[in-house]
Amino acid sequence: MMTVLEFEISGTAACRQTGTFQVPSACKQLRMTYTLDKQYGFLVFVAVKDPKGQIRLQKQLSSTPVLQIGETGRDTTLGGIPGRICEGKWQIEVCLFAEHVHRLTGGKGIPFSFEITDQGDTVEEYVGDNIWADEQFVYSGFDQKKVYREGARWYKGDFHTHTRLSDGKELPTGASRKAELMGLDYYMATEHNVVH
């Protein structure tokens, strides 16, 4: 399977653009490679939906030009929900941050595309083994009732950070390690337009 979907960043292009592609049966991975130059990546937020309309990947295009959804967290790009790749019509939804388009493009149109294949490969920015949400995007890996520390005192932490899910420089695992090394009591990644 191989499909190419075309999109455009411009002052006249729709802020929300969609494209669909057909996934065959017995597909194990979906690999989506985009052609947009890195300098324009942060202008675009992408969501990939399966045939049931469930979001299976959400990410701001800001780092590696390859997105992948697989059956495990090791073959799924950060921002993706690993699991079974169902047969049927899938959708890529591209949303542009319109308030920055004209200023950064000088008014010219910037075409870009996604090449979608069922030939997966290793993933540089993978989700990992700690999967927080299931295929229906229901959070199952976070216990809201668990108390990590009690007592009145000053707590040291950060409520506003970004990772490579949006426009940050770190993967979540690296950012978490840094927080531990700094002795933070809490660390909260607050991505642009992304829930994770």
Where are these regions (language model features)?
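Solvent-exposed, flexible loop/coil segments flanking beta-strands in beta-rich domains
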Residues: 1-35, 116-120, 128, 145-151
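Surface-exposed beta-strand/loop patches in noncatalytic accessory domains
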Residues: 3-11, 35-77, 116, 120
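Short beta-strand/loop motifs in extracellular/secreted proteins, especially
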Residues: 28-30, 40-44, 110-112
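Short acidic, gly/pro-rich beta-turn/loop elements at beta-sheet edges
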Residues: 42, 56, 102-104, 124-126, ...
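A metal-dependent hydrolase metal-coordination microenvironment
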Residues: 147-196
